[in-house]
Design a protein with these regions (language model features):
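Membrane-interfacial helical/loop segments at transmembrane boundaries in membrane proteins
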Residues: 65-80
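Membrane-embedded and juxtamembrane structural elements of multi-pass membrane proteins
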Residues: 2-63, 81, 85-242
Length: 242
């Protein structure tokens, strides 16, 4: 493995962008997921993520030398603006933007946990009993608190280490609660929160690449669709529709 340089970083960005474009164009359809499953998508995303976070040239890689395109691009980027190379300015902007995005992202996580701790966990006996039955059905021993959040538009699960389920502040039937808890618990058991978290880090670092945002949407949509398939595969048509 050779040290990172401008050439290896450019190759890393080019390879990753082509892979992300391929994933978004060919792998986001429901037909693809049904035929190949979600593992193929997550494996490809994992390869892209590792490559994006390791911008080095590896000894086992087959490197193709560029005698025209790369030299032309680097000569173009080495034009000086007020005695500073344009490439240096770009690197500073990209690094500053990445650090700022990472800082803001973790600040939002800390602020969110702080706001959550100001709420009291749900103590409704009926809701807790239904949730306890679902936990037992899924053989899940993790302690997961439930919060009712005013103004929340839809149920969600949050938290990587200490997950919590968030419910909008309204009335629910027993059947609604069962489906909500099964849906959110499946996200936790299949590590969907971790998948999204790691890709959020990639988005923070590659904030300037629009394809990273498109793959973030792909990961979320894939997780939701796979979850729906798991919950409805053994249900009758009326239940699936509901």
């Amino acid at each position: 493995m050779t040290p990172a340089n401008y050439g290896s970083v450019f190759s890393c960005c080019l390879f990753s962008s082509l892979m992300m474009l391929y994933l978004y164009v060919f792998c986001r359809s429901k037909r693809f997921i049904l035929r190949n499953g979600t593992f193929v998508i997550y494996l490809a995303v994992g390869v892209v993520m590792i490559r994006m976070l390791l911008p080095w040239n590896f000894h086992f890689a087959a490197n193709v030398e560029s005698h025209k395109i790369l030299p032309f691009l680097f000569n173009l980027l080495r034009v000086k603006i007020l005695s500073v190379e344009f490439l240096t300015i770009l690197v500073i902007i990209f690094c500053f933007g990445s650090c700022l995005r990472l800082a803001l992202y973790f600040y939002k996580l800390v602020r969110y946990r702080h706001l959550l701790h100001q709420l009291d966990p749900l103590d409704d006996i009926r809701i807790l009993r239904i949730f306890s039955d679902i936990l037992e059905e899924y053989h899940c021993t993790k302690q997961i608190l439930i919060y009712q959040v005013p103004g929340l538009s839809s149920p969600a699960i949050s938290g990587l280490i200490h997950p919590v389920i968030l419910l909008p502040d309204r009335e629910y039937s027993d059947q609604d609660l069962r489906f909500i808890f099964m849906h959110e618990l499946n996200h936790y058991l299949h590590h969907d929160l971790w998948k999204i978290f790691f890709w959020e880090l990639v988005v923070c670092i590659y904030w300037w690449n629009p394809l990273s945002y498109m793959i973030r949407r792909l990961i979320k949509d894939t997780a939701e669709y796979a979850n729906d398939i798991r919950l409805t595969k053994d249900r009758d048509e009326l239940t699936r529709t509901n």
